[in-house]
């Protein structure tokens, strides 16, 4: 899932991804946007 959060590193994406998927969230930063996934 691409979320509308700008990022330069995956660490910035983890908090918003955890809000969506809980503690089993995976976060990636691609093309300046956060991509969340459920692990």
UniProtKB/Swiss-Prot annotation:
It comes from Centruroides elegans. Expressed by the venom gland. Weakly blocks Kv1.3/KCNA3 voltage-gated potassium channels (Kd is estimated to be 69 nM). The record marks 28 as: Basic residue of the functional dyad. Has the structural arrangement of an alpha-helix connected to a beta-sheet by disulfide bonds (CSalpha/beta). Keywords: Amidation, Disulfide bond, Ion channel impairing toxin, Neurotoxin, Potassium channel impairing toxin, Secreted, Toxin, Voltage-gated potassium channel impairing toxin. The modification Isoleucine amide is found at residue 39. PROSITE patterns: SCORP_SHORT_TOXIN (PS01138). This is Potassium channel toxin alpha-KTx 2.12. Belongs to the short scorpion toxin superfamily. Potassium channel inhibitor family. Alpha-KTx 02 subfamily.
């Amino acid at each position: 899932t691409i979320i509308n959060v700008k990022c330069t590193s995956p660490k910035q994406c983890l908090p918003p991804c955890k809000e969506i998927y809980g503690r089993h969230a995976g976060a990636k930063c691609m093309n300046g946007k956060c991509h969340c996934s459920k692990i």
